[in-house]
Each structure stands twice: as structure tokens, then as C-alpha cells.
């Protein structure tokens, strides 16, 4: 008799210096759902600890962290440096896999979606944009990586 497969749980993260959008997907369906956002902490360590709490509470097995790759090849942004540090801290605190995923234009796409579909004001869209962007990041990752489902 074969052992049942462990449930795979993913957390999508749209990292920002003010707010961090979050999305969730779990086996067997792997449908990405927005789960809100958290405010960034005063330090990277504080932010990573807030994320670690969510990761441990939800028993996440893999974090998909949006990586804002600049449009021009060879450039690196200060935000990318923070994301690399956050990635290392998450791995240190939680011992989970962290995948850096290209998030170019995900926030802009999320903003357009909310503006067109919901009729919300800019103020009302603020936090929702971040969690929708995290959902887009996680969905793109899951759709381009079908082997992770098995």
C-alpha cells in the first residue's frame, strides 16, 4: 500500500515596502486565492517574522516570492536586494522552499483588473491590489510549473 502524498501548500507573495500582498493555493486543485495583505515591518527581519508566522500557521511548503526584474537587462533595483534578503530570512526562520518568480507588471495588471471589474475607488483598491498581484504571481508560477502538482 502506497503512502499518501503530502499536501502541497503554496503562498504567493507580492513584496512591497509598505504592504505585502498574499495569495494561497493548495493541492489537489492549486487554485490561487487572494488572502489579503500585511503591513511591512519597520525592519526586514520584522517583515520576515510576520511572513514566517503566516507560513507556519498555514503549513506552507513553498513560498513564491515576486521578483521585480527590471525591463532593461543587467539592471538591479534596491527592491530586488530587499527581496533577496527577505527570501534568505524566510528560509532561515521557516526552512521552506522559496522560489523567486518574475513579477514584472503584476501590480499594474492587478490595478487594471480592479479598476475595470470592481468599480472601486483608488483608496478602496489599495490593499486589494497587492493581494491580487500576489494571486497573479502564484497563478503564473503554478501554470508554468505543472510538474509541481505531482
UniProtKB/Swiss-Prot annotation:
Keywords: Cytoplasm, Hydrolase, Nuclease, Ribosome biogenesis. The keyword Nuclease applies. It is an enzyme of class 3 (hydrolase). Its EC number is 3.1.-.-. CDD domains: YqgF (cd16964). GO terms for molecular function: nuclease activity. One of its GO terms (cellular component) is cytosol. Pfam families: RuvX. Could be a nuclease involved in processing of the 5'-end of pre-16S rRNA. Belongs to the YqgF nuclease family. This is Putative pre-16S rRNA nuclease. It comes from Chlamydia felis (strain Fe/C-56) (Chlamydophila felis).
Amino acid at each position: 500500500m502506497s503512502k499518501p502524498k503530502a499536501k502541497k501548500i503554496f503562498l504567493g507573495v507580492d513584496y512591497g515596502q509598505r504592504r505585502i500582498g498574499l495569495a494561497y493555493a493548495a493541492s489537489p486543485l492549486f487554485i490561487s486565492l487572494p488572502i489579503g495583505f500585511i503591513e511591512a515591518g519597520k525592519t526586514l527581519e520584522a517583515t520576515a517574522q510576520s511572513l514566517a508566522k503566516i507560513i507556519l500557521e498555514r503549513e506552507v511548503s513553498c513560498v513564491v516570492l515576486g521578483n521585480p526584474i527590471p525591463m532593461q537587462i543587467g539592471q538591479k533595483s534596491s527592491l530586488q536586494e530587499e527581496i533577496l534578503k527577505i527570501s534568505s530570512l524566510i528560509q532561515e526562520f521557516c526552512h521552506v522552499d522559496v522560489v523567486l518568480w518574475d513579477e514584472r507588471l503584476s501590480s499594474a495588471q492587478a490595478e487594471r483588473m480592479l479598476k475595470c471589474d470592481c468599480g472601486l475607488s483608488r483608496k478602496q483598491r489599495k490593499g486589494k491590489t497587492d493581494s491580487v498581484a500576489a494571486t497573479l504571481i502564484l497563478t503564473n508560477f503554478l501554470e508554468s510549473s505543472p510538474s509541481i502538482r505531482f
